[in-house]
């Protein structure tokens, strides 16, 4: 069965319709394909349902960059510029805007001090922390329109970019009136944009198909 290697700002994934795979082996960069995660997709009555797994094999209810990659894969197959994708327990809207994929996501739920849930749990760290309970985001405000972000992802480690981490970091600083309603997020892997309209966040990034292969 074919698999598709994708990346969005260096956050890379294997997309496949194969259901029974060893996620850890597939993600291993020395003995497998190499990726931050695996996204298993299923087309059910013209609906796209996908589940995301971290590199260590653990399940995650949401992955922003992963969702953008699936959206690009799906819209190219459907020859469309708009789609709906179920990831985990929610359905998301995605569309092309010039060279970017844009996804629409409900604003995060505030759980505690700097701690949010956006499908998965993220903390905007104001100090150096070590935890395996949630994703950690280290953000620097360069100006009211620009953030620099690094994310340590639960089940993966340091990644070149994290879509949900960028969205949560933006939202955290936006509700504290430290950034404007639309920002550019700079990560080690590249640039994305996040903005807010009513109760929804919009995340825009370029997703790229790196190569296609066959999985035994």
How does the language model describe each region?
Residues 1-98, 116, 122-216:
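A glycine-rich beta-to-alpha transition motif near the start of alpha/beta enzyme domains, typified by
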């Amino acid at each position: 069965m074919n698999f598709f290697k994708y990346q969005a700002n260096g956050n890379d994934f294997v997309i496949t319709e194969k259901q029974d795979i060893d996620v850890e082996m597939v993600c291993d960069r020395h003995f497998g394909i190499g990726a931050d995660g695996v996204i298993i997709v299923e087309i059910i009555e013209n609906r796209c349902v996908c589940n995301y797994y971290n590199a260590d094999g653990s399940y995650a209810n949401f992955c922003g960059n992963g969702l953008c990659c699936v959206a690009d894969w799906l819209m190219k197959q459907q020859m469309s510029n708009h789609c709906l994708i179920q990831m985990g327990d929610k359905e998301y809207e995605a569309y092309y805007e010039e060279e970017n994929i844009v996804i629409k996501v409900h604003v995060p739920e505030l759980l505690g001090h700097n701690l949010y849930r956006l499908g998965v749990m993220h903390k905007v760290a104001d100090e150096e922390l070590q935890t395996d309970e949630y994703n950690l985001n280290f953000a620097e405000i360069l100006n009211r329109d620009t953030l620099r972000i690094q994310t340590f992802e639960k089940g993966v480690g340091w990644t070149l970019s994290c879509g949900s981490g960028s969205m949560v970091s933006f939202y955290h600083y936006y509700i504290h009136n430290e950034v404007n309603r639309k920002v550019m997020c700079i990560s080690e892997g590249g640039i994305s944009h996040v903005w807010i309209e009513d109760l929804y966040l919009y995340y825009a990034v370029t997703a790229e198909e790196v190569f296609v292969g066959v999985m035994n």
